[in-house]
UniProtKB/Swiss-Prot annotation:
Catalyzes the acyloin condensation reaction between C atoms 2 and 3 of pyruvate and glyceraldehyde 3-phosphate to yield 1-deoxy-D-xylulose-5-phosphate (DXP). This is 1-deoxy-D-xylulose-5-phosphate synthase 1. CDD domains: TPP_DXS, TPP_PYR_DXS_TK_like. Thiamine diphosphate binds at H82, A123, H124, S125, G155, S156, N183, Y292, E374. Coiled coil: none annotated. Homodimer. InterPro entries: Dxylulose-5-P_synthase (IPR005477), THDP-binding (IPR029061), TPP-bd_CS (IPR000399), Transketo_C/PFOR_II (IPR009014), Transketolase-like_Pyr-bd (IPR005475), Transketolase_C (IPR033248), Transketolase_CS (IPR049557). GO terms for molecular function: 1-deoxy-D-xylulose-5-phosphate synthase activity; magnesium ion binding; thiamine pyrophosphate binding.
Length: 648
């Protein structure tokens, strides 16, 4: 057994129980406090895993915000929440940090039920400005709300929702602070000089003079530096020769500011708080992974990490027992793309997370990363399909929710053959309820023209990719869970499946279990438990929720006293469609006992996937108990045909 990593010495942080304690610290002490918070973040995440790089990048900004503003009366809204660990440490949750992302522990994101310092929960991007503006207008209408501050990253601000909020905030012209945390752009020396000059001026003059001050500084510089400063300012503002983009939207723009310069941050935030009347955007440039060399040198690899050695940065990864679903998808799609030049892939800022980075390395001109823009991703894919391409739109289940109108209106209504790759289906573990893939089956299966599949294992996933490649009759979707497969034998190449055709994987006579998706192995385990009690069980894999294999369902009903459907999704999904079919086809007329097993009607909090499914009542033991109870109430109808359920 290894000894735990020694915790860092943090004399200043030890004195801070809540942000109010920071008011007594000098600016120099606040700078040292930031160093201690950074050490604490590294120590914590080394033990728990989590989002490291983003949190390290905002340490100074977090300290400065809590030192200047009066949270929780002032509402500090973090976008996404990946970067919230320093915030949690400073707001009374330090002693709980080593429970981060664990069962019964702290969330990895901001969460209203966790702390008064988390006024708005986050885990999906680009929501912060809208929420902060809502708080600001609540204040204007008499609610006990102080200042409102939204902290949003340069990735999140690419999403349309952020610009909708900026546009509305500019129109309302109420006091609101937006901090643009830009961690993808370094500051060259001329830009640093410009930023410092603007910081000094902002502490002495109204913000309205900042543009004139910037122009004056540029004019005073030698030729090459003057041109460089002008280009740099235009680069970060995007509106050469006129107002900045943010100013055109009605904001006062300040920046860029070095987000690791505590003095500059404190001066800027204090001046903003003292003088602002309308909305102001402060552009802060930070470095992802700041202060920890492994994370600075590989920000993509240290965005989200497993437990790691804080000295070397080496992450602790368990040995895989079976292929990873996402990698199976990425590799298989790449092989199919080598055979079919019409195949393209689309991702919304998640090339590695969705596996399309594998194809991107081989066919870079056929993989499109559209940024955090799921709505655009879906309709862009629809356009590609309309042009004759075979687009695979790869988006996590929980993020696909953001593009639902586009799926319905731009894809399904026009019957365009977009292939939806739905990763992270079902419960996902440490990221908890915000990232659970619970609702996609329900909201997609209800759409006309849609074909919907769910992979029972990694081999089935390969077959479904091949099916999607061959399917040009309309939109088609397939879903699969996070993590490892179940260790089945893998085919060399996928077989095209017949749409709406399931398979029987085990034959029995008493009760039938019809599984949709990756809970098939739990259904098979349940069958073994029942078999040991003398109950004969048929287990079938539906493969499709739309179209349903009604022939298979009919045969299961005719030959069994009870039928149990099992799925890794919410109510209103596969089982609901089976029940609807049976109700309209007379399947219940003879006394069939049907039980529909889904995720419960609540959000399931973070834990290991095994614990989450136990909480949901979807273990093999739960399936067996449900089947046992159904069998006790069902009765066998006279057979209307003699054929047994077909096996594949």
């Amino acid at each position: 057994m290894t000894n735990p990593t020694p915790r860092p010495e943090t004399p200043l942080l030890d004195r801070v129980c809540c942000p109010a304690d920071m008011k007594a610290l000098s600016d120099a002490e606040l700078e040292r406090l930031a160093d201690e918070v950074r050490s604490e973040v590294i120590s914590v995440v080394a033990e728990t895993g989590g989002h490291l790089g983003s949190s390290l990048g905002v340490v100074e900004l977090t300290v400065a915000l809590h030192a200047v503003f009066n949270t929780p009366t002032d509402k500090l809204v973090w976008d996404v929440g990946h970067q919230c660990y320093p915030h949690k440490i400073l707001t009374g949750r330090r002693e709980q940090m080593r429970t981060l992302r664990q069962k019964g522990g702290l969330s990895g994101f901001t969460k209203r039920s966790e702390s008064a310092y988390d006024p708005f929960g986050a885990a999906h991007s680009s929501t912060s400005i809208s929420a902060a503006l809502g708080f600001a207008m609540g204040r204007e209408l008499g609610q006990p709300v102080g200042d409102t501050i939204a902290v949003i990253g340069d990735g999140s601000i690419t999403a349309g929702m952020a610009y909708e909020a900026l546009n509305h905030a500019g129109h309302l012209n109420k006091r609101l602070f937006v901090i643009l945390n830009d961690n993808d752009m370094s500051i060259a020396p001329p830009v640093g000089a410009l930023a410092r000059y603007l910081v000094n001026l902002s502490s002495k003059a109204p913000f309205a003079t900042l543009r004139a001050a910037a122009d004056g500084l540029e004019a005073s510089l030698p030729g090459p530096l003057r041109d460089g400063a002008r280009r740099a300012r235009q680069l970060v503002t995007g509106m050469p020769g006129g107002g900045t983009l943010f100013e055109e939207l009605g904001f006062t723009y300040v920046g860029p500011i070095d987000g690791h310069d505590m003095e500059a941050l404190l001066q800027t935030l204090r001046a903003a708080r003292a003088r602002t009347t309308g909305p102001v955007l402060i552009h802060v440039v930070t470095k992802k992974g700041k202060g920890y060399a492994p994370a600075e040198n590989a920000p993509d690899k240290y965005h989200g990490v497993n437990k790691f050695d804080p000295v070397t940065g080496e992450q602790k990864k368990s040995v895989a027992n079976a292929p990873n679903y996402t990698k199976v998808f990425g590799s298989t799609l790449t092989e199919e793309a080598a055979r079919d030049p019409r195949i393209v892939a689309i991702t919304a800022a998640m090339p590695s997370g969705t596996g399309v980075d594998i194809m991107q390395k081989r066919f870079p001109n056929r993989v499109f990363d559209v940024g955090i823009a799921e709505q655009h991703a879906v309709t862009f894919a629809a356009g590609l399909a309309g042009a004759g391409m075979k687009p695979f739109c790869a988006i996590y289940s929980s993020f696909l929710q953001r593009g639902y109108d586009q799926i319905a209106h731009d894809v399904a209504l026009q019957n365009l053959p977009v292939r939806f790759v739905i990763d992270r289906a079902g419960l996902v573990g440490a990221d908890g309820a915000t990232h659970a893939g619970a609702f996609d089956v329900g909201f997609i299966t209800s759409l006309p023209n849609m074909t919907v599949m769910a992979a029972a294992d990694e081999a089935e996933l390969i077959h479904m990719i091949a099916t999607a490649v061959a399917f040009d009759e309309g939109p088609i979707a397939f879903r699969f869970p996070r993590g490892e497969g179940v260790g089945v034998e893998m085919p060399e190449r996928g077989t095209v499946l017949e749409p709406g055709r399931g398979r029987v994987v085990r034959e029995g006579t008493d009760v039938a279990i019809l599984s949709f998706g990756a809970h098939l192995h739990e259904a098979l385990q349940a069958a073994k438990l029942l078999e040991a009690e003398g109950v004969s069980v048929t287990v079938a894999d539906a493969r499709f929720s739309r179209p349903l294999d009604t022939g298979l369902i009919d045969q299961l009903v005719r030959h069994h006293a009870a039928l149990v459907t099992v799925e890794q999704g919410a109510m209103g999904g596969f089982g609901a469609h089976v029940m609807h079919y049976l109700a309209n086809s007379g399947g219940f007329d003879g006394g069939l006992a049907l039980r529909v097993m889904t995720l419960p009607d609540r959000f399931i909090e973070q834990a290991s996937p095994e614990d989450m499914y136990a909480d949901a009542g979807l273990r093999a033991e739960d399936i067996a108990a449900t089947a046992r109870g159904a069998l006790a109430r069902g009765r066998v109808m006279p057979l209307r045909q003699t054929a047994k359920p077909r096996a594949v």
